[in-house]
Amino acid sequence: MSRYTSSVLAIALALAAGAARAVPPPAAAEPPTPAGAVPPPPVAAMPPPAPGAAAPVVAQGQVQRLLINPYGEVDGLRLADGTVVRFPPHLSQALSAAIKPGDAVRVIGRPQSRGSVKADAIVNATSGQTVYDQPPPPDAGRPLPPHLRAQALRPQRVEGQVDAVLTGPRGEANGVILTDGSIVRFPPESLRLSVLPGAPFAADGLGTRNALGTSLEAISVGTSLSALQPLYDRTP
């Protein structure tokens, strides 16, 4: 098995774990309506809850950049004060259409750790457009299996200084944003390198480069491209 094929499988497993947390499960089938009863309106016809009805505003400010995952999908924002706002990647198109860098936003949701929040809704304070966290529509179709999605990833290499450390819900480091905006993700238990803002950092792996920047799932990391060390002791 080639290094590239083995790496694709490893990345597929790592990304599948993140996708399983990010995309909500499909809704259960509705029970049949009893004879003579008035059926409820379809879910699509029900408006989302009003902003602030279920959760408070947990962050607000100007959008510094849109964050993307290794597939190139928008899965959050970074505000000018450094706050990282997480949002499900299946809403990438809706979020990137409603929110642009420089826009002022209000974020409704829940705080997580180290300056990050999980958004239930993001409001463009200027236009009033609001993007809600909601399941994919019933006609969206089933997503591709992780190993097929991973085939679309391409080798990427980045090098620079750490601008911000990304963390999971329990505060574990699972990625970095470099000063040029490149995003590197990695399993928290795999990193053998201390990462702090301002530190030199380099990585190679599989990911995407598009108009919003570069994002990759790391296979190896180091303080420079000439000093990379593998994250995995062996490939699957």
Residue ranges and their predicted role:
Residues 25-56, 133-155:
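Short boundary/loop segments of OB/S1/cold-shock single-stranded nucleic-acid-binding domains
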